[in-house]
Amino acid sequence: MSRNNEELQGISLLGNQKTQYPTGYAPEILEAFDNKHPDNDYFVKFVCPEFTSLCPMTGQPDFATIVIRYIPHIKMVESKSLKLYLFSFRNHGDFHEDCVNIIMKDLIALMDPKYIEVFGEFTPRGGIAVHPFANYGKAGTEFEALARKRLFEHDAQ
């Protein structure tokens, strides 16, 4: 069953040939659409191998692969808006751990998912690789326990 125009309202970036790339951190660029299967529990996974941010101390670029996994509830993130949102970090100065937590919190605010996790595999700098992991499970649901379990086992992946 195809989506109708009413279901696609609010999606303005996908298919737009005049894409404007943000020059600074832009959470407002994120767009969501309705999940047609809110009663099914399933994972959506995004692998974003070209993430870039700036070191807040030196201004030097940091590169990472960001992996986002979530179990949607009512809303889902539209992928082109996610791409542009992640691009908006290109001139944003923050530590790796901050970037991962900011991404997770912005996606929670947008979608209110049942569960979400964000993993950053940053390129080593000074001989040290930083791989922050942040997750969230909706309070009072089975996903709260899943978040705790995944947090303690995330390095076993």
Swiss-Prot record:
GO cellular component: cytoplasm
Pathway assigned in UniProt: tRNA modification; tRNA-queuosine biosynthesis
Reaction(s) catalysed (UniProt annotation): 7-aminomethyl-7-carbaguanine + 2 NADP(+) = 7-cyano-7-deazaguanine + 2 NADPH + 3 H(+)
Family: Belongs to the GTP cyclohydrolase I family. QueF type 1 subfamily.
The protein's role, per its UniProt record: Catalyzes the NADPH-dependent reduction of 7-cyano-7-deazaguanine (preQ0) to 7-aminomethyl-7-deazaguanine (preQ1).
NCBIfam families the UniProt entry points to: QueF-II
Keywords, in A-Z order: Cytoplasm, NADP, Oxidoreductase, Queuosine biosynthesis
InterPro entries named among the record's database cross-references: GTP-CH-I_C/QueF (IPR043133), NADPH_dep_7-cyano-7-deazaG_red (IPR050084), QueF (IPR029500), QueF_type1 (IPR016856)
Protein name: NADPH-dependent 7-cyano-7-deazaguanine reductase
GO molecular function, a single term: preQ1 synthase activity
Protein location: Cytoplasm
EC identifiers of the protein: 1.7.1.13
Catalytic residues (positions): 55 (thioimide intermediate), 62 (proton donor)
GO biological process, one term: queuosine biosynthetic process
Binding site for substrate: 77-79, 96-97
